Swiss-Prot record:
One of its GO terms (cellular component) is mitochondrial intermembrane space. It comes from Oryza sativa subsp. japonica. Required for the import and folding of small cysteine-containing proteins in the mitochondrial intermembrane space. Disulfide bonds join 65-67, 76-109, 86-99. Its main location: mitochondrion. It is found in: Mitochondrion intermembrane space; Peroxisome matrix. Keywords: Disulfide bond, Mitochondrion, Oxidoreductase, Peroxisome, Protein transport, Redox-active center, Translocation, Transport. Residues 1-35, 123-151 are annotated as: Disordered. This is Mitochondrial intermembrane space import and assembly protein 40 homolog. Residues 7-26 have a biased composition (Low complexity).
Length: 151
């Protein structure tokens, strides 16, 4: 979840991955971490899916998916629920771009509670921040680059 504070959820709308069928399980073992928010959303939205339900009912069922239980019940649960719900309900062309505030709140909570998250999530955030910094270029102002007349 390594978005910059001035950036929306970096969720680029791509074709949705195929729906993943939730295999019935007798033990509530934690699911492996999905590679992206889109994958997590697709998995959660396919949980107990019924095409004739309102978006609010679909979001609630997605939040009931075991694939998000650890995030929902952790120390940043309310921030996760707000951000994830907003992302699922988003109708913007760039999915989730209208959810900046909830994702910033989630990001802030993750920074305050790093012990509650896997190293994989925290490293992903650090890598995103490093990549963002490496894309920055410092250029001298135009006035300083202009040639000065010789006297």
């Amino acid at each position: 979840m390594g978005q910059g504070l001035s950036q929306p959820a970096q969720a680029v709308e791509e074709p949705s991955p195929p729906a993943v069928e939730a295999a019935p399980s007798s033990s509530p073992s934690p699911a492996p971490a999905p590679s992206s928010l889109e994958a997590l959303a697709a998995e959660a939205m396919s949980f107990d899916e019924d095409g004739n339900e309102s978006i609010d009912v679909k979001v609630q069922k997605a939040l009931d998916c075991p694939c998000v239980a650890e995030l929902k019940n952790g120390p940043c649960g309310s921030q996760f629920v707000d951000a994830f719900s907003c992302f699922l309900k988003s109708t913007e062309e760039e999915k989730g771009s209208d959810c900046v505030k909830p994702f910033i709140a989630l990001q802030d909570c993750i920074k305050i509670n790093p012990e509650a998250f896997s190293k994989e999530i925290l490293e992903e955030e650090e890598n995103d921040e490093e990549a963002e910094k490496s894309n920055l270029k410092v250029r001298a102002p135009a006035w300083s680059r202009e040639s000065k007349p010789k006297l």
